Amino acid sequence: MADVNQILRVYGKHLQKNVRLKALAEKAWSYEDAHKFADEAAGLLCDVLKMYMDPATVTYDDAVRIFEAAMQKNYSEVTKVCAKVQRDMYRKAGVGLNALTPEFNAEKARGIAQVITDAEEVTDDYMRNLVKNNALGVVDDMIRINSEASENVGLYVHIVRKYDDVGLHNGKDVCQWCMEREGEWDNYQEALAAGAFERHPGCGCVIDYHVGKTHTWSNTKGAWNDV
């Protein structure tokens, strides 16, 4: 039986010792940086899970215990970085709002446990796609709830989804499903309706957003235009 506490301890040590992740956590200034952090932190978690859990023999109940605890730890690390990004974003926009944090979704963790225990074979890539998808979903949820909240108080938002040729896309044909969701929106509801926050397992698309008091975002300047 896998020791959940041991998994969490080792994962925590891996996070502390990883120079690149520490730098990303400290210097992240955009949700794209948060995306990179979530992706790499999830990769570390997969390495630890591989050390202590055998997908071929783990029971559903044990898998639930492992994934709920591991995903919650990952969620905590990712939301800390996202909250920093959001606070900096509000500070630069000159508004005194607090960053909102989505609740931990234990149902997703249980869903991964179900998929793992039901699968006839679980490859390393398959596991990584599931775990990374969950981690990137936390970043997406941070963007979703904060962009909606910003818009609700009269601020202007600019949401971007960029296609990224990684994960299941790597070495394969262009993913039409993701291409249909790529774009830029100046309205949260339009981005939501366009599927900007949706992912499939292995999806590496990058979602970012900006907030400001003016109504037009300049990609060239990387700043809001004065009006």
Kindly give the residue locations of the regions a language model identified:
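Domain-core detector
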Residues: 1-200, 208-227
